[in-house]
């Protein structure tokens, strides 16, 4: 359906009297369809009324825009009508005269008879015929609000804006007016946006409920689709379990935001913190292509230029790296994309340990390789693999670096898309990337999913060929991220910004083909890729099929297309996959978890420090290769459509404290 109203990357900043600024709204985007009823909810100070005023044209956004039917909103207009909590009726005019004032002012191009007809029809529409000639002091509060709504509808607006219209009314009157408003909007075909604190009101009236995060810098945290058919009956809705599922979703979001506000207040650093922030930082990594920005920032002095002394420590396994983080032997690390989420939740029976990621360091860069004997058997595609496995009782033994590693998650997704159950039809073996090539040569495994370094070495040795790259499954996926302990980040935010700034500059160099020789020279040092650097960083990718190597653009992605943005939308997808394969329940408190892990504020400060433009990716979903749409606001619905999955559980997850 076409877009009627678009809120396009809106920022709203207010200057403070004593200097400084207050960021009310930050990068808010929303598309509204014709005839849709949208409710905005969130705690006080989250910018609900600010957003409503921007849509009304009563204020202009600091950046971004409001687009109504293809035209930018720059001022109030008769196509929009605002109904406030206070009725704003003229006390010396009757109900009819208050409505007529709006009609005569706006619809002055209509003749007198037409205007009178509109007034009388509107009086009947809101059920005020008996009170048409009464003055405001002669009618109840509920009737006054109906007059305000009638005045709004009488000018035939395309968009009705309501700012807590029933907040001051008693429960009975409020309930009656809610049902009347629902009927009126449906009969008139009006598009409506309403601010409310009442979750039951939002569910009754809305097609979608937009949940805003805490201010300052409020954003859209989640959008809930209310899929009850219309016309709606309150009691019928409340008798269904689905109603309470939706209600709990709203309340859960608000509770998470309340906890986030308390946590932010408790974690606010003392004014003297900046001067005493740590400048010597130990960072861990596993050698591979993904460590290129880390190596470049270190060897070209980008960390040092920003006053940092960085010590890099390499590890053979992800378990060893995680142990060093937990023991306080590292201040941060180049981590698997899902690792900050997993550590903060305490996956694998570990104690929850809060990790934040302010930067995605690399994207893509992996593949799925099989032993060459399967190439000789004619396995050149996923379909071929399915046919081969159907004809033999053999189960493939496929090595993965870690159950939560992106190569493992993409491998599972890829297999399941063809009807292969990764828990039954193949055997997944956890293995250090260092061991994979030799294990394949020895016949201990039939293939593996890993980064380009291991793939290239296996192909060069004549032991493997590539069946698929991760670009074939999810182009642009997050691969490695900068992970920092939350407790350390709270007292060293400026150091974290400097780390990110250096890595941003390094990522830009790594994505510049003119810098290839320079990068090879750095990475061929023994602590990084060593002698394998020349093979791994060759310009063309060898699939091991006997064909000429192929150039694959963005096989490794370190900078272009907002590659470094720490995207909570991608984090939601990661949570669905961890849940899909039984590694964790789908967290009911996922918004709280995502807000803690994905530190976009640090990223944005680093972007500003480096001077790169701040361009945020879309936050409204995506598809992998199988074209199954992923909606970040409905992760459970996304999971339920897959036939191959572990039993799905949804539960609140106890999160780590910062200490």
UniProtKB/Swiss-Prot annotation:
<dbReference type="InterPro" id="IPR003439">
    <property type="entry name" value="ABC_transporter-like_ATP-bd"/>
</dbReference>
<dbReference type="InterPro" id="IPR017871">
    <property type="entry name" value="ABC_transporter-like_CS"/>
</dbReference>
<comment type="function">
    <text>Part of the ABC transporter complex NrtABCD involved in nitrate uptake. The complex is probably also involved in nitrite transport. Probably responsible for energy coupling to the transport system.</text>
</comment>
<keyword id="KW-0813">Transport</keyword>
<dbReference type="InterPro" id="IPR044527">
    <property type="entry name" value="NrtA/CpmA_ABC-bd_dom"/>
</dbReference>
<dbReference type="GO" id="GO:0042128">
    <property type="term" value="P:nitrate assimilation"/>
</dbReference>
<dbReference type="InterPro" id="IPR027417">
    <property type="entry name" value="P-loop_NTPase"/>
</dbReference>
<dbReference type="InterPro" id="IPR005890">
    <property type="entry name" value="NO3_transporter_ATP-bd-like"/>
</dbReference>
<dbReference type="GO" id="GO:0005524">
    <property type="term" value="F:ATP binding"/>
</dbReference>
<dbReference type="InterPro" id="IPR050166">
    <property type="entry name" value="ABC_transporter_ATP-bind"/>
</dbReference>
<comment type="subunit">
    <text>The complex is composed of two ATP-binding proteins (NrtC and NrtD), two transmembrane proteins (NrtB) and a solute-binding protein (NrtA).</text>
</comment>
<feature type="domain" description="ABC transporter">
    <location>
        <begin position="5"/>
        <end position="239"/>
    </location>
</feature>
<dbReference type="GO" id="GO:0005886">
    <property type="term" value="C:plasma membrane"/>
</dbReference>
<dbReference type="GO" id="GO:0016887">
    <property type="term" value="F:ATP hydrolysis activity"/>
</dbReference>
<keyword id="KW-0472">Membrane</keyword>
<dbReference type="GO" id="GO:0015414">
    <property type="term" value="F:ABC-type nitrate transporter activity"/>
</dbReference>
<keyword id="KW-0534">Nitrate assimilation</keyword>
<protein>
    <recommendedName>
        <fullName>Nitrate import ATP-binding protein NrtC</fullName>
        <ecNumber>7.3.2.4</ecNumber>
    </recommendedName>
</protein>
<dbReference type="Pfam" id="PF00005">
    <property type="entry name" value="ABC_tran"/>
</dbReference>
<keyword id="KW-0406">Ion transport</keyword>
<keyword id="KW-1278">Translocase</keyword>
<dbReference type="InterPro" id="IPR003593">
    <property type="entry name" value="AAA+_ATPase"/>
</dbReference>
<comment type="similarity">
    <text>Belongs to the ABC transporter superfamily. Nitrate/nitrite/cyanate uptake transporter (NitT) (TC 3.A.1.16) family.</text>
</comment>
<keyword id="KW-0547">Nucleotide-binding</keyword>
<feature type="region of interest" description="NrtA-like">
    <location>
        <begin position="279"/>
        <end position="659"/>
    </location>
</feature>
<feature type="binding site">
    <location>
        <begin position="42"/>
        <end position="49"/>
    </location>
    <ligand>
        <name>ATP</name>
    </ligand>
</feature>
<dbReference type="Pfam" id="PF13379">
    <property type="entry name" value="NMT1_2"/>
</dbReference>
<keyword id="KW-0997">Cell inner membrane</keyword>
<keyword id="KW-0067">ATP-binding</keyword>
<feature type="region of interest" description="Linker">
    <location>
        <begin position="255"/>
        <end position="278"/>
    </location>
</feature>
<keyword id="KW-1003">Cell membrane</keyword>
